[in-house]
Amino acid sequence: MHPIRQRLQFLFSSTKGLILMAMAMVAVVTALFGMLSGPMAEWGVRDVVVRLLGMKLVQAEREGRIIILYHSIAMAIIAIESYMITGLVKMRPIHRVVVNTGVTAGYLTTMIFGLLFAYWGRLWPFHGLFIAGLTVMFSSGVVLTVALWPWNKEFYIKGPKSEYARTRSGLDLERAAFFAMAATTVVSSTFGAVAGAYFGNGFEAFLAENIIRSPEKTTLEYSVIGHLHIMLALIAIAVTLIIGRWLDFKGLYQKIAMPLMILGVVVLNLGVWGVVTPLEPIAHMIIYMGATPAMLAALMLVIFGFDKLIREGVRGIDRPTFGQKISALTRDPLRFGSLWQMVFMNFTVSGIGILMAVRLDEIFRVWPAREERIELTGHWHVLSAIIATIILFYYGDLTGLKGRLRQWYGWLIIVLSDAAFASVTFFEMKRLFISEAQQQPLVNWLMAGIDFGLGSLLVVLAALMVWRLTDLFKKKGLWTREAAEENLYQVAK
Amino acid sequence: MTRKFASIRRLLFTTLVMAALGMCACGPADVGAPVPVYDTGADTTEWASIPAGEFLEGQHETAVSIDHDYEMMVFLVTYEQYAAYLNDALATGTVRLVDNTIVGHYPGDEFRGARHEVRIDPGDYLHVALNDPALRLEFREHAFTVTPGWEVHPMTMVTWFGAGAYCDQYDWRLPTELEWEKAARGPLDGRESNRPFPWGSEIARNNANYYASRDPFESMSSYGSRTTPVGFYNGKIYGAFATIDSHSPYGLYDMAGNVWQWTGDVHPFEHYRYLRGGSKDTYDMDLRIWVRNSAAPTYASPGVGFRCAR
């Protein structure tokens, strides 16, 4: 076979190649478009990039551009998760091929044509292709849902005893959780699609954080707000399930976690869908009721995973000390990191949300809307980035990082990302402990933490991508082995 | 091998701890740092006439009409003007000095019990807190004076009640959001009627005072962004800093950047009051004409000021 065709076949048809390709696309888009805002704009980098690349940035179209950028990145992340799911969960080969082909075509079309439309002049055929890309992603989601159908006897857990959660008849509850996540993702995407079609027709793009204080919101505005929240929550739930599969989550904790996860996913979605119904006044309460079991399920995974890492690490030691246990827990930064980030998320996302809710009257009822916006956008950017780092940990393992390289890669991601996320969290909350007039030195330190952390993280990602790129030039590179692997870590149940 | 891995972890954790310690060691900014003084030539008593008629409102450019002529101050209310007002108002009793704060009466708003709505009953409300180090006023021997150097800077650290009371004192009022927006955007006359900034389509660092706009009043490494004198961006050159004349189509200055400006609307179902124009502390995107900010009427900040309408 022609060498170029072989490599393209690896990138576009093998599971690991597809993941690599999507990660490279996200890395390029993040690096490029990250130069258009925040400190990069402050330092004048934005102006240079805009001039060099011939971008056309109309002031009134900023919100629309950002919406397209978010969707472009989100579709690539959903594609990566889909590849991981088709590689981890048993399904018919035809389903795997259709899903992988669909999401690849979908995210690439969405990303390429969406960004061309948004940043290089409004060429309408590109907008049409952007929508077409999203539609293909939706259709692939439907196929994935069908592929994950848990009542297919072929995929029941057989045998008298099992370490995995199942019903008495053998229904695999983890598969049911994947199915619930996929099915509700497909339904929830329509909450964005319907509202998007309406606002898009009138080209009245808006960012949800800018209408948060409107006392009267329309049903379609609620729909957009619900959509963005639930989609991010479902992406987080998907990555939790993926990590569970990677770590071979089983035993008592898994048997408790899976029913909780299914319940959480269903109730959480019902709550979010409720925002466009007369249930809107109590929708938040329903959402809390759904979020709690879902987060408890994630806690079960963390407990299981930590315990597993410690057991593996102290094997052969009669009476391990606390220090030896900690050392065992942190020996593999990739597996530890993926679980640690779920714990850390509680300090930077959930904890902040709870604190804000408790002190609502003295914070949001008084603070200016722009401060509230910082807190809102800050906490969901952190959640998105935490999900991205968890994917990076898993990918590091998938790509076979070992020894010192694995240590540097894993620990750099943990330390750099957490330094950045902690800085973002302090930045969001700064008004609680420093006045506007006195904040600048603190802001400078925090911004340095954010910029250094995220910037260095991108350098780590770039190093990984360069390594994989150079590998593609080798005749017998890592890619030749990965091309032959269809499944990732599928565990026979 | 394990020892090597442990050293990697140790190195990274040490770096993190050092960074955290560095952050804890940073002190607050020097609020009293000296301020440069420039003569902008602004006549702070000037008013701009805005005729009735249509303009393009909002980001999505909806044609809206205002059915009355009105006037708005060409410049933001300055510290000098507010100090003079406070001395008058204290003498006539329209405001009172209570526990190091200036308070005044407000007749209250109708409370509709909407979600998140906070009740504003008739009573005395905060106008200015005198003990805030960011306030550029001094109260000595029963009279207010301005901290030297800040005389023609916009009055800040003033609540919505304090801003409204100033305008009331002279039988003026705060502009409505719609009036403010028309004054910034200009009439619907076909010539850049949809301009996103009061002066046109694009923004440069010498158009307005915004975050990290590098004006002579800011030092991002120490005290951060500070206000510029009213009407500073008038095409003059101040030392090495050349400004662009950035008035709105009706001739108003500082309609983008410098300080957020209180507007007068009391919207039903909410206690929030709305602010327009962006400030020294926001990125350029918040200086676009249609961008809204809101806060409780008791909120005060070094980045919030006002101007009056009549």
Regions found by a protein language model. Give the residues of each.
Chain B
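Short, low-complexity, disordered segments immediately C-terminal to signal peptides
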Residues: 31-39
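C-terminal motif of bacterial Sec signal peptides marking the signal peptidase cleavage site
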Residues: 23-25
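A short glycine-rich, aromatic-capped structural motif
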Residues: 41-124, 157-161, 257
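Bacterial N-terminal signal peptides that target proteins for export
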Residues: 2-15
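Core domains of carbohydrate- and sulfate-ester-processing enzymes
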Residues: 97-143, 206-216, 220
